[in-house]
Amino acid sequence: MEEEKLERSIRKSEIPGLTREEEEAQLAKVIGIAEQNLEQAKADIRLANEDLADLMETYDAKEAEGLALWNNATAKLNAYQHGMARLEKARKKPYFGRIDFQDPRLSFLESYYIGRVGISDEKAEPVVLDWRAPISSVYYENSTGPCSYTVSSEGTFSIDLKRKRTYEIENDHLKDFFDSDVVANDELLTKYLAKNKKAVLGEIIATIQQEQNLIIRRSPKTNLIVQGVAGSGKTTVAMHRISYILYNYEEDFRPEDFYIIGSNRILLNYITSVLPELDVYGIRQMTMEQLFIRLLYEDWDEEKYMVHTCLLYTSDAAD
């Protein structure tokens, strides 16, 4: 798969420029592609709605065949709607970063923009990479120079990072951009927070720190415990980790495989409202009290949850 991507990139004859004028032209180009994709998504949703309406007129929901067709059509419609939601988010701020690098397997420089969601042109060539893509980790973890990224089940690839650029884009307009030797991610985060004390999630994605990124991208096949003081970003990292796992391990994990356990409903409601911003839907949640009730009354397994009684003795001296 990775080799196929590299072969496709060989056909790219143009690398985006470095000046402000060239960057503004590139932004306009990407926004144009995003708008085309958005119009196509709207057309797909209209057709999916028509197909669902036809099925409802043709089949009775009580029929096994009809119910199966209804469910498939509904799932297809939901997928289109989620896709359109992603495109709408990318429309006014399609990307926040860029990496230029040399792959030793190729004889030319490669360049990729990184955003909250991936954007592809009509030929299915990526013009913006999703922040959860394996190679996007280079943007978060490395300074310029030799580095590497890992693709699950394919191995680790070494590259030479030539440039890491961060963009400040608002409502279709390029306000500013910085190279890694001018401003670091933590400085950019400080700038965002100074502008808006309650930074929106899209800006947080752009300013994920190296240590946070390592936690987010760690393999889900092993247990992971993250400790930190209140307000240190544990919940934010956990939400991004769920999004990353569902994106990169879709054959192994589904949304219903996750449970978010919180101390109160206020926290859980906040998490539920934020997860769709990370392209995550259908995650189940419960409070600690609900968890204990479920363990005691719904999922109780005498062999798994054994209660051992014991007697405590106190000596006369202790009395």
Feature-to-residue mapping (PLM):
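Walker A/P-loop
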Residues: T235
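Hydrophobic anchor at the beta1->P-loop junction of P-loop NTPases
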Residues: V226
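Alpha-helical nucleic-acid-binding subdomain
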Residues: L246-S315
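Motif I (Walker A/P-loop) of helicase-class P-loop NTPases
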Residues: A238-S243
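The conserved Walker
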Residues: A230
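Extended, charged low-complexity regulatory segments
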Residues: M1-I205, Q209, N213-L214
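Phosphate-binding P-loop
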Residues: I215-K221
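Conserved Walker B
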Residues: A318
